């Protein structure tokens, strides 16, 4: 587990400890007591990790395990990879590892192992969690289980609402520019990179550890559709910043990207539909130079909005 700043303040360290205690208790006998202690009465689970699977399973009468998924994956172990904290926020990046041995949102047990990423954005007040926002790599999960999105009785699919909120890039940069310090400078570099989608601001030796639309990119190449060209497929694409965190040498940014599907996307013909999904980016700096990034987009959400949830499965 990598901490963005292992020498963070006592207050931030307390927030991190509460967040990790909450996460590590899930599915254990200690969970009910831990939740009573670390979840505020006003706690808002703004987004669940399996957001799309849960939404599409709603009202179908399928047996499903509920919030913590332990009935479907009883040997689940979450492997923490990254931790960041700033102000009242804590971010956790972890891998969900488990064996699928129980019903899961309409998917019968497969006996297969999974190892997928999930990210959590948490807010705390007085040492308790008041908000949780989670996103799991649901496409990777379905691919590893070897299944498609379960069919609903009505034959339909439940697409997510357009993620279109957040702060304009220019406004975000101007706000950060009023805080002249290294952390703000790093955030400015990351925010400005979303103005053109051209990868500006990265050092020559920059490494991309994960592309945001990694599954669509791989599918597009494998299916003979060439490199994934989001800007051609969504020519009016624009991004808006939901939240940023900076600590030590690391910047986290959650933003919404969207527009009109006006061109071919990995072989999906233009639909004219409006799309908009959340994306998380983790950027690492050395001496003010952006040297590494890891990006994770809600690809299943995008495909649901296009009416093509199974195209890469």
What are these regions (language model features)?
Residues 1-313:
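C-terminal and inter-domain tail/linker signature
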């Amino acid at each position: 587990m990598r901490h963005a700043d292992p020498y963070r303040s006592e207050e931030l360290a307390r927030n991190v400890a509460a967040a990790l205690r909450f996460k590590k208790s899930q599915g254990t006998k200690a969970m009910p007591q831990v939740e009573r202690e670390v979840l505020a009465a006003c706690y808002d689970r703004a987004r669940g990790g399996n957001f799309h699977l849960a939404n599409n399973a709603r009202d179908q009468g399928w047996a499903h395990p509920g919030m913590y998924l332990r009935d479907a994956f009883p040997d689940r172990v979450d492997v923490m990879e990254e931790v960041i904290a700033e102000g009242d926020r804590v971010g956790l990046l972890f891998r969900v590892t488990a064996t699928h041995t129980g019903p899961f949102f309409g998917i019968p047990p497969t006996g297969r192992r999974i190892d997928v990423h999930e990210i959590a954005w948490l807010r705390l007040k007085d040492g308790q969690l008041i908000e949780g926002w989670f996103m799991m790599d649901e496409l990777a999960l379905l691919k590893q289980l070897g299944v498609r999105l379960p069919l609903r009785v009505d034959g339909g699919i439940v697409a997510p609402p357009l993620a279109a909120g957040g702060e304009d890039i220019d406004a975000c940069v101007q706000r950060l520019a009023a805080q002249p310090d290294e952390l703000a400078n790093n955030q400015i570099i990351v925010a400005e990179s979303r103005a053109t989608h051209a990868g500006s601001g990265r050092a020559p030796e920059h490494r991309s550890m994960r592309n945001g639309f990694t599954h669509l990119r791989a599918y597009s190449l494998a299916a003979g559709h060439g490199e994934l060209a989001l800007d051609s497929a969504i020519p009016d694409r624009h991004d808006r910043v939901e939240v940023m965190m900076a600590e030590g040498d690391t910047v986290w940014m959650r933003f919404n990207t969207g527009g009109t599907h006006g061109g071919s996307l990995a072989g999906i013909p233009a639909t004219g539909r409006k799309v908009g999904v959340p994306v998380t980016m983790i950027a690492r700096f050395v001496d003010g130079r952006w040297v590494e990034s890891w990006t994770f987009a809600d690809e299943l959400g995008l495909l649901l909005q296009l009416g093509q949830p199974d195209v890469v499965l």
